[in-house]
């Protein structure tokens, strides 16, 4: 296992694996190079997921109206009634017949 590790390290450093293997066989490797430092502790931040809104049709998104709770539609009138809404004053109501004073 140590030889495999030595070969991997040698390949990573760009040295000849044969020369490095011969060198490590004759001299013991220092312990500082083979020990690994403990990795730094990483903190994982969790994202806060919002609840997905209900899906709507595209037209409903574009033409959103601010509707009040159960608003009644006004009564529909004929077109002429809309145009002449304020012109009812020209007709005077019929006066009751004058009664002779006795």
UniProtKB/Swiss-Prot annotation:
Propiece span(s): 22-58
Domain of life where this protein originates: Bacteria
Keyword set, alphabetical order: Periplasm, Signal
Pfam families noted in UniProt: Asr
Bias-annotated ranges (Low complexity): 22-41, 91-102
Record bears the keyword Signal: yes
Basic residues: compositionally biased ranges: 80-90
Location of the region described as Disordered in the Swiss-Prot/TrEMBL record: 22-102
Chief subcellular location: periplasm
Family (UniProt): Belongs to the Asr family.
NCBIfam families, sorted: acid_shock_Asr (NF033636)
Chain's role: Required for growth and/or survival at acidic conditions.
The name this protein goes by in its record: Acid shock protein
Source organism per UniProt: Shigella flexneri
Gene that produces this protein: asr
